């Protein structure tokens, strides 16, 4: 039951991850054996639901990689369902201020600390009440990562960092660059300056900074600045680009694709 991902962040051990967008338990298991510290099952931009997340959690469970799940929104009902199927670490998107961060934390805690509904007899998380004292232990194993993706969220970062129960803050470079007027260009100097400043600020607060970036040089730079959970690729991108490159090498008509953010 111990959340080893949360423990690693608390100990200051950098965790390298991979984004999962294929919404497949089969590919999730394949990638769980690849050597990443964590795998992000994306419910915001990939066609996932509670059932597909459940199958991915089951597929990843035998491997050292730790699962992180991103719901589609900061919604306590959706969060409750994801926790009941076994999610312990959540990446909550588009958190704009401290109040929204508190709502995310409360959604992961049983009363009186929060508002998570008690349904452990039906929950994989408690192994259907086979885990002794699950209701008493669960709150401490929840890891809440909130995602800041706009100028407003950046402005409110000091207050977000003061919220008890927030374990880490993830910077969303794609949405942030769009909000700053540089859509599709997260490497713009102004965007990079904002990202670097935020990473340092988050780490100095005692929280864990995180980010997704497929550029290896930038990923290493963020780690040097103190980022603790860094996703360095996306499964859909890896598959698409590798397939195109293979087709091109054998003379097939590969589709010309403009390089994306990831």
UniProtKB/Swiss-Prot annotation:
Biological processes per GO annotation: 4-hydroxyphenylacetate catabolic process; phenylacetate catabolic process
Family: Belongs to the HpcH/HpaI aldolase family.
Source organism superkingdom: Bacteria
CC cofactor: a divalent metal cation
Record-listed substrate binding positions: 147, 174-175
Residues that, per the record, bind a divalent metal cation: 149, 175
Manner of cofactor binding, per the entry note: Binds 1 divalent metal cation per subunit.
HAMAP family: HKHD_aldolase
Site positions per UniProt: Transition state stabilizer: 70
Protein name: 4-hydroxy-2-oxo-heptane-1,7-dioate aldolase
Keyword check for Transferase: no
Site (Increases basicity of active site His): 84
Function of the protein: Catalyzes the reversible retro-aldol cleavage of 4-hydroxy-2-ketoheptane-1,7-dioate (HKHD) to pyruvate and succinic semialdehyde.
Active site: 45
InterPro entries named among the record's database cross-references: Aldolase/citrate-lyase_domain (IPR005000), HKHD_aldolase_ent (IPR023701), HpaI (IPR012689), HpcH-HpaI_aldolase (IPR050251), Pyrv/PenolPyrv_kinase-like_dom (IPR015813), Pyrv_kinase-like_dom_sf (IPR040442)
Pathway: Aromatic compound metabolism; 4-hydroxyphenylacetate degradation; pyruvate and succinate semialdehyde from 4-hydroxyphenylacetate: step 7/7
């Amino acid at each position: 039951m111990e959340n080893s991902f949360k423990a690693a962040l608390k100990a200051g051990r950098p965790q390298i991850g991979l984004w999962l967008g294929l919404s497949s338990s089969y590919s999730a298991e394949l990638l769980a054996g690849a050597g990443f510290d964590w795998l992000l099952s994306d419910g915001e931009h990939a066609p996932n639901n509670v059932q597909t997340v459940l199958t991915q959690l089951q597929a990843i469970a035998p491997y050292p990689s730790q699962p992180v799940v991103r719901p589609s929104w900061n919604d306590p009902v959706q969060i409750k369902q994801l926790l009941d199927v076994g999610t312990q670490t959540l990446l909550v998107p588009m958190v704009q201020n401290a109040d929204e961060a508190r709502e995310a934390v409360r959604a992961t805690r049983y009363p009186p600390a929060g508002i998570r509904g008690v349904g452990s007899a039906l929950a994989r998380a408690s192994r259907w009440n086979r885990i002794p004292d699950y209701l008493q232990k669960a709150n401490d194993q929840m890891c809440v990562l909130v995602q800041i993706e706009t100028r407003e969220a950046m402005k409110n970062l000091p207050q977000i960092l003061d919220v008890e129960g927030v374990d880490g803050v993830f910077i969303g470079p794609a949405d942030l660059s769009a909000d700053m007027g540089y859509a599709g260009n997260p490497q713009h100097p102004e965007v990079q300056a904002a990202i670097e400043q935020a990473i340092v600020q988050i780490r100095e607060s005692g929280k864990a900074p995180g980010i997704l970036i497929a550029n290896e040089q930038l990923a290493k730079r963020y780690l040097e600045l103190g980022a603790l959970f860094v996703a360095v690729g996306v499964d859909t991108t890896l598959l698409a680009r590798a397939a195109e490159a293979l087709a091109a090498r054998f003379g097939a008509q590969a589709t010309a694709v403009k390089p994306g953010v990831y």
